[in-house]
């Protein structure tokens, strides 16, 4: 049974991943872990089915219950975010951004976004979604010391280039963005604000960051698996007058079948967030602030001390003096502390493989039930590695010991399956 041998090799790799992750501190800011209830939706028969189009207007038969689930998902999203319209069909955050750009722009238009070194996501740049749409990309002025958009400079830039879209939101996203100011300026030249909430969607839903919809953003996009601990996928929230344009951009424009098991899982995650979201988001930000303060006290160069370090789940650390982001991220991984190397504002964007910084996130540690005392201890462990006080192999033992106490998902529905446990369904 040669095919089964191949299956066994895959299964062994998956098993090793799960066993290893149980012993790690997952601090990559773009990840999270779903609850058992959400995870269960991902293995339903919905993953085998097709349902092109809108509920009630499908191109396939057999969608009665699929429609029921998608309508519930849309309703929950609108309720949770206070949105006039929601589309839950994008298969990723980048697809959600593409949908917004296809709905609001024409090829040859200009948009404004953040440089990658200033925290901007690649899907705001001509190498990604704007390039696919044939757009010209210019950059928002940025205050590197405050890690913030220069509001006066932004307004002048909008008046100068008259963009069709101003893209707010970021991949390195420490503080809220100036939504109201951007809306006022861009509406005067006939444009729109698209707020990419991928990283902070859960913080927004929990009322702990800013509220871009109430601040006037015309469209809010996001991925559903970062601070919002749902399945991997995307979402678009918008004002009612843009609903048809957004929906047509998603289907038939960008998505055919839209991964129905993810819609079911997202519906459960949205329901969870109505119950637990405010507390989870509050604790995530509280943990990030505590971790940043503790890292700074340990002697690390944490950005924006004068602003309280962060208002989100993220922390940025300048590790140039310790060898750079690539070296330090690798050393931390050797200690089972998982983060990512990250460009900082002064970095050459062509050297993203070896930037100055690392980015840390507290959203998954919080989901595991860790709190302020754990943040202080984790800061000590990180500093031990970054500052060379101990060998990563020695720190790894302490990390594994800490993780033994935190193996369950908190702030969610369902129990009986560990956070990073593989719920086996078949015998091999």
From Swiss-Prot:
(6S)-5,6,7,8-tetrahydrofolate binds at residues 120-122. It is found in: Cytoplasm. Signal peptide: none annotated. GO terms for molecular function: glycine hydroxymethyltransferase activity; pyridoxal phosphate binding. Pfam families: SHMT (PF00464). Pathway: Amino-acid biosynthesis; glycine biosynthesis; glycine from L-serine: step 1/1. The record marks 225 as: Plays an important role in substrate specificity. InterPro entries: PyrdxlP-dep_Trfase (IPR015424), PyrdxlP-dep_Trfase_major (IPR015421), PyrdxlP-dep_Trfase_small (IPR015422), Ser_HO-MeTrfase (IPR001085), Ser_HO-MeTrfase-like (IPR049943), Ser_HO-MeTrfase_PLP_BS (IPR019798), SHMT-like_dom (IPR039429). GO terms for cellular component: cytoplasm. It catalyses: 5,10-methylenetetrahydromethanopterin + glycine + H2O = 5,6,7,8-tetrahydromethanopterin + L-serine. One of its GO terms (biological process) is glycine biosynthetic process from serine. The keyword Transferase applies. Its cofactor is pyridoxal 5'-phosphate. The modification N6-(pyridoxal phosphate)lysine is found at residue 226. It is an enzyme of class 2 (transferase). The keyword Amino-acid biosynthesis applies. Transmembrane segments: none annotated. Homodimer. NCBIfam families: PRK00011.1. Belongs to the SHMT family. This is Serine hydroxymethyltransferase. It comes from Methanopyrus kandleri (strain AV19 / DSM 6324 / JCM 9639 / NBRC 100938).
């Amino acid at each position: 049974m040669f095919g089964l041998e191949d299956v066994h090799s895959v299964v062994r790799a998956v098993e090793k991943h799960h066993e290893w992750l149980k012993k790690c501190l997952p601090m990559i800011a773009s990840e999270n872990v779903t609850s058992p209830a959400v995870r269960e939706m991902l293995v339903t028969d919905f993953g085998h089915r097709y349902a092109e189009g809108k509920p009630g207007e499908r191109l396939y038969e057999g969608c009665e219950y699929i429609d029921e689930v998608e309508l519930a998902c849309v309703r929950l999203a609108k309720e949770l975010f206070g949105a006039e319209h929601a589309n839950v069909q994008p298969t990723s955050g980048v697809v959600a951004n593409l949908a917004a750009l296809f709905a609001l722009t024409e090829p040859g238009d200009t948009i404004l976004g953040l440089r990658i070194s200033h925290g901007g996501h690649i899907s705001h740049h001509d190498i990604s979604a704007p390039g696919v749409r044939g757009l010209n990309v210019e950059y928002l002025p940025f205050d590197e010391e405050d890690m913030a958009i220069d509001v006066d400079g932004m307004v002048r830039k909008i008046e100068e280039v008259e963009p069709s879209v101003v893209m707010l939101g970021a991949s390195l996203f420490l503080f809220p963005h100036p939504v109201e100011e951007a809306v006022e300026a861009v509406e005067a030249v006939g444009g729109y604000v698209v707020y990419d909430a991928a990283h902070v969607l859960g913080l927004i839903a929990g009322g702990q960051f800013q509220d871009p919809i109430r601040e006037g953003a015309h469209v809010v996009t996001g991925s559903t698996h970062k601070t919002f601990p749902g399945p991997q996928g995307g979402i678009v929230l918008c004002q009612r007058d843009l609903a048809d344009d957004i929906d047509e951009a998603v289907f038939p424009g960008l998505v055919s079948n839209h991964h129905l098991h993810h819609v079911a899982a997202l519906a459960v995650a949205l329901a969870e967030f109505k119950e637990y979201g405010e507390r989870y988001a509050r604790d995530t930000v509280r943990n990030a602030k505590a971790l940043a303060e503790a890292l700074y006290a340990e002697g690390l160069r944490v950005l924006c001390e004068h602003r309280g370090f962060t208002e989100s789940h993220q922390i940025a650390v300048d590790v140039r003096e310790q060898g750079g982001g690539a070296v330090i991220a690798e050393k931390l991984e050797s200690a089972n502390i998982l983060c990512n190397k990250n460009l900082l504002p002064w970095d050459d964007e062509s050297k993203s493989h070896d930037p100055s910084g690392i980015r840390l996130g507290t959203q998954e540690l919080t989901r595991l039930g860790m709190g302020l005392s754990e943040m202080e201890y984790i800061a000590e462990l990180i500093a031990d590695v970054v500052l060379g006080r101990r060998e990563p192999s020695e720190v790894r033992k302490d990390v594994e010991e800490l993780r033994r106490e935190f193996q369950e998902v908190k702030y969610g529905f369902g129990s009986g399956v560990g956070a990073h446990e593989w719920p086996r369904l078949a015998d091999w």
